[in-house]
From Swiss-Prot:
Names of required cofactors: K(+)
Sequence positions that bind Mg(2+): S229, T250
Keyword tRNA processing assigned: yes
Amino-acid positions noted as binding (6S)-5-formyl-5,6,7,8-tetrahydrofolate in the UniProt annotation, renumbered to this chain: R20, E79, K119, K438
Record Pfam families: MMR_HSR1, MnmE_helical, TrmE_N
Known EC number: 3.6.-.-
Full protein name: tRNA modification GTPase MnmE
Entry's Gene Ontology molecular function annotations: GTP binding; GTPase activity; metal ion binding
Function as written in the Swiss-Prot or TrEMBL entry: Exhibits a very high intrinsic GTPase hydrolysis rate. Involved in the addition of a carboxymethylaminomethyl (cmnm) group at the wobble position (U34) of certain tRNAs, forming tRNA-cmnm(5)s(2)U34.
Plastid recorded as keyword: no
Annotated organism of origin: Parvibaculum lavamentivorans (strain DS-1 / DSM 13023 / NCIMB 13966)
Self-association and partners: Homodimer. Heterotetramer of two MnmE and two MnmG subunits.
Cofactor detail note: Binds 1 potassium ion per subunit.
Length: 438
């Protein structure tokens, strides 16, 4: 096994940089750079780092040794905390490259070794990646729960129940002469039904976890000159869109990223909806309608004296936020409509509060684990389909072999999500529960 090394902190100038080594030669590399043995595990040691060939001083910093298996990767790990100048980092990386048995790590290789050594399952690996990429508080909370194992533990608990059911089925098939009740297959029905119900409820989540991870899309739609671009600028706090009295100024979808109540939101300003005269504006209207249809939430905006496709709120859906702009001109605000002035800022606080309440209630991070990736959903769907077949086979009185095969497929589908499929753990369950071979 090779020892790998890499810069663990972001590239560029900084006060501190951290280099990480992992593998059997990590301890020897530390001695080659410092002329000293590794200190006590997990204790910082002040060192002078030298070039292993010329012995020229490179930097002065801290070294920390994490012996296997109590480390991130499960291998011997060394962290070198050095000054974050580009020249210092480059010199230290060159020095590490001179040492035998060391090579530069590939992207994600430290985390891959952590997975291969059983320190993380795949959902925890994905949670770690999401935590690094988190931009908002809700994203951070969701990613941290997943990184700490909440999602993987749920799937492993379901898989353990499946393995137990499979063990009963296999026991009846493979050990007919042992003291195993003959009606075990019939007793599996309630357990399978309970698992089906729990997995179905988990799948029926409105894709909230995926949307929170990727961001919620909010589209501003309405006729030309309703003030959509002005509202985008007001909510963004900057001049992101061109504002003009000329109708049809916005011809493509303009996006800004916002943090609303801890939830990442992509706010999209769309072309004004009207019977466009030119081909370019017609394409803008087509894109606006498509974007509005695909959005998770829409702000339907109108203003006095403007008209377009679906005058007023004719295009509004029941869950849309309805906004009347230019109330500073004295327009009456109907019930269920938020009155604003994108020009003066009047009513913007009320709109932001309504938007935060709508987004927050639907997409805030939940206490229970949620699906965060399409592959999780696909694996759960495969598991549910196999369970449905197993239940149907039970009710039809088919052979135990058919039931066992579907239970096995269901367990493997869950195991693929966490990356811990193990064909040997079936025998462990059988011996523990039935004392076969005793």
């Amino acid at each position: 096994m090779e020892t790998i090394y890499a810069l663990s902190t972001a590239a560029g100038r900084a006060g501190i940089a951290v280099l990480r080594l992992s593998g059997p030669h990590a301890r020897a590399a530390l001695r080659a750079l410092t002329g000293r043995k590794a200190g006590a595990p997990r204790e910082a040691m002040l060192c002078r780092f030298r070039d292993p060939e010329t012995h020229a001083a490179l930097d002065r910093g801290l070294a920390i040794f994490f012996p296997a298996p109590a480390s991130f990767t499960g291998e011997d790990v060394v962290e070198l905390h050095i000054h974050g100048g580009r020249a210092v980092i480059a010199a230290m990386l060159r020095a590490l490259g001179q040492l035998p048995g060391l090579r530069a790590a590939q992207p994600g290789e430290f985390t891959r070794r952590a997975f291969e050594n059983g320190k993380l399952d795949l959902t925890e690996v994905e949670g770690l990646a999401d935590l690094i990429d988190a931009e908002t508080e809700a994203q951070r909370a969701q990613a941290l729960r997943q990184m700490e194992g909440a999602l993987g533990q749920l799937y492993e608990a379901w898989r353990a129940r499946l393995m137990r059911a499979l063990a009963y089925a296999e026991a009846e098939i493979d050990f007919p002469d042992e003291e195993v009740p003959g009606d075990l297959i019939a007793k599996l029905g309630p357990d399978i039904e309970a698992l089906e119900t729990e997995i179905a409820a988990h799948l029926d989540d409105g894709r909230r976890g995926e949307q929170l991870r990727d961001g919620v899309e909010v589209a501003i739609v309405g006729p030309p000159n309703a003030g959509k671009s002005s509202l985008l600028n007001r909510l963004a706090g900057r001049e992101a869109a061109i504002v003009s009295d000329e109708a049809g100024t916005t011809r493509d979808v303009l996006e800004v990223r916002l943090d609303i109540g801890g939830v990442p939101v992509t706010l999209a300003d769309t072309a004004g909806l009207r019977e466009a005269a030119g081909a370019i504006e017609q394409e803008g209207v087509r894109r606006a309608l498509a974007r509005a249809e695909a959005a998770d939430l829409r702000i339907v905006m109108v203003a006095p004296g403007v008209s377009g496709i679906g005058n007023g709120f004719a295009l509004a859906r029941p869950d849309d936020l309805r906004v009347l702009n230019k109330v500073d001109l004295g327009a009456e605000v109907p019930d269920g409509v938020i009155g604003i002035s994108a020009l003066t800022g009047q009513g913007i606080d009320a709109l932001e509060a309504a938007l935060a309440a709508r987004v927050g209630s639907a997409y805030e991070a939940r206490e229970h684990p949620v699906i965060t990736r399409a592959r999780h959903r696909e694996g759960l769907a495969d598991c549910a389909a196999s369970l449905a077949r197993a239940e149907a086979a039970l009710k039809a009185g088919r052979d135990a072999e058919l039931v066992a095969e579907d239970l096995r497929l269901a367990a493997r589908a869950l195991g693929r999500i966490t990356g811990r499929v193990d064909v040997e753990d079936l025998l462990d369950v059988i011996f523990r529960d039935f004392c076969i071979g005793k």
